[in-house]
Amino acid sequence: MEDVNAYMEIIKENIEYEHHMKYGRWQDKGLYEELYEVICEIVCVKHKTVKIGGNDYPYELVKSKFLKLNSSHLEYVIGCMQETTTKIANIKAYMVTALYNAPSTMNHYYQQEVQHDMYGGGI
């Protein structure tokens, strides 16, 4: 149980949980809380593998990536989910996949947004 509490505190610090609960947009607080809970569950409940986008990944790899998530990654996931108009059948699996992929896709996403706004008729 000590490890679980330690991991939960590390995650809270990494994602600036207290700051977002105190100063974040009220409509995003519930979403932030849910993402925090999903991260904690993935990190604290040991499995042989974790299913990400239909594929099984080694637990230790997923745990390592989830322990590196920060507030920017969560804000990116929340933003992407708010823009999604497609019906999501398994919201938890979608959240896990989005969190796992956030560090690998976030910078390219924002770069593409800038390119579109500057040169693609977005302005």
What positions do the PLM features span?
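Electrostatic interaction modules used in gene-expression and signaling proteins
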Residues: 1-123
